[in-house]
Amino acid sequence: MSKSHAAYIDYALRRTTNMPVEMMGSDVVRLKDYQHFVARVFLGLDSMHSLLLFHETGVGKTMTTVYILKHLKDIYTNWAIILLVKKALIEDPWMNTILRYAPEITKDCIFINYDDQNFRNKFFTNIKTINSKSRICVIIDECHNFISKSLIKEDGKIRPTRSVYNFLSKTIALKNHKMICLSATPIVNSVQEFTMLVNLLRPGSLQHQSLFENKRLVDEKELVSKLGGLCSYIVNNEFSIFDDVEGSASFAKKTVLMRYVNMSKKQEEIYQKAKLAEIKTGISSFRILRRMATTFTFDSFPERQNRDPGEYAQEIATLYNDFKNSLRNREFSKSALDTFKKGELLKGDASAADISLFTELKEKSVKFIDVCLGILASHGKCLVFEPFVNQSGIEILLLYFKVFGISNIEFSSRTKDTRIKAVAEFNQESNTNGECIKTCVFSSSGGEGISFFSINDIFILDMTWNEASLRQIVGRAIRLNSHVLTPPERRYVNVHFIMARLSNGMPTVDEDLFEIIQSKSKEFVQLFRVFKHTSLEWIHANEKDFSPIDNESGWKTLVSRAIDLSSKKNITNKLIEGTNIWYSNSNRLMSINRGFKGVDGRVYDVDGNYLHDMPDNPVIKIHDGKLIYIF
């Protein structure tokens, strides 16, 4: 049915031929062609009630949305605009962009942050105040967070945000309102998020059905056929976060480096104690204590079970202060720092004070030592992602930075009042090479909504639970024209994943999380392909054989058809002759996978999904006694 969708897209574009490509307020900006295209379609089809902007970080989805909001009155007189956003993103980018390019809509805007404990009450209170003659346009920024907060908990409890989700899914189309969802990573943790998002945009279209069988989509064609026009898809980098990507005129080159570091004996000792503590307390599935132990360890492991919280907190504070005091008036000499900046380690002729300090710091954290050495050897500015703030996280890392003489800013929950200004200073043209501020260390607070310019190295100290979060992190530094001020030879970003290892070869929590991420991505890649093939851009570019229409009366019927996956049309069982193989998508063998090569030369993954044909002259490497095909 994509031909039918193409006819409506064509109709919308014909209706909006004269829509200006510039947006003017106190400043003027000219929209990119892809921004103007999606705005014209969404505004040109009044009965297109909802749309997902699946745009990668840095391509201007906020700007696109503000342009749409500015032109809502081209199709109806009275609008109330409700923006559901994270609190940290209200001022920048949303308010700043609106005031700069569309100040006239400010009076119509209602901002509600969905991470507020009273979000549900505030939302419905505001809904009641809206004039009945007004149409509503709802914007959900970083909609994957909103969806996550709307999922029913494993224990069956319904989250407060779910009532807002239900209201929007029932009301938007019924009352002729409009809704735009924005995300660079619309699916983060589970396939259920895809179902939730689809039913928010197209209510009732995807009932409780199993989307996958043996990790393969049951009927991709049915999904694509029924969900045409669901989204706008602007994703220039479709590679895995673990793949290298060549640079272009607008985007910096990305190179991924896996930095494996062997934990010190002290760290291994504390790591094993952390593992036992997780088992005793029943939190081993979260791996929090082990993740912290791979990052930094005090001289002892503070037990938390069956203890007064105040007493436990006091012990942590004492351990922190003891470590901080041990570094008082200590720092590396200029000679040592010059050695580190060359990418070298201390030699035998180094001072006893430098060697002693380095040894003490490494015993407690090989990761922090590795990061500091990497930063000093970097030719430009650096980002460091550390999800933990207190105890063994950023608070400790900053002590290491001080000893190594690394200038820095912090973007975390501890710096809410100063972090936006600090990032602005970090991004200044005068700091392009990191002369004033070398590094920004950020927690999960910095994973969304902010931009960094002229970054050359990103160090990821702790694996997240999903690839989407890693994309958000890396996407902060590789954005459209983010390196325009950087010298041509430094328009690159090295992404360093720092992975801790045990001396006995057993997998660590870092390696466990790496495997979890790869397992999830197999299903997500297929769902992202559905988004791509149902997008306005894909349909407009690939469906040309349609009969033009002169009204939009059939759009609602077209997009209201239920999806039926019961027939499982594309699931076929077939026995194929061939041989088992090992393959990797990286020349550096960052991940090695089991696969299968049929006698016809077709290559499949371990679940039977076709990957591609075997090249005539494949690249093969030998690793641990295995022949590894490089694809």
Curated annotation (Swiss-Prot):
Residues 457-524 are annotated as: Binding to the cap-specific mRNA (nucleoside-2'-O-)-methyltransferase. It catalyses: a ribonucleoside 5'-triphosphate + H2O = a ribonucleoside 5'-diphosphate + phosphate + H(+). Its EC number is 3.6.1.15. Belongs to the helicase family. NPH I subfamily. This is Nucleoside triphosphatase I. A motif (DEXH box) lies at residues 141-144. Residues 42-204 form the Helicase ATP-binding domain. The keyword DNA-binding applies. DNA-dependent ATPase that acts as a 5' to 3' translocase on single-stranded DNA and thereby plays a role in transcription termination of viral early genes. Uses forward translocation in concert with the viral RNA polymerase RAP94/OPG109 subunit and the capping enzyme/VTF to catalyze release of UUUUUNU-containing nascent RNA from the elongation complex. In addition, acts as a positive elongation factor to assist transcription through problematic sequences. The keyword Lipid biosynthesis does not apply. GO terms for molecular function: ATP binding; DNA binding; ribonucleoside triphosphate phosphatase activity. ATP binds at H55, E56, T57, G58, V59, G60, K61, T62. It is found in: Virion. Residues 367-532 form the Helicase C-terminal domain. PANTHER family: SNF2/RAD54 HELICASE FAMILY. Its main location: virion. GO terms for biological process: DNA-templated transcription. GO terms for cellular component: virion component. Monomer. Interacts (via C-terminus) with RAP94/OPG109 (via N-terminus). Interacts with the cap-specific mRNA (nucleoside-2'-O-)-methyltransferase OPG102. It comes from the Viruses. Keywords: ATP-binding, DNA-binding, Hydrolase, Late protein, Nucleotide-binding, Transcription, Virion.
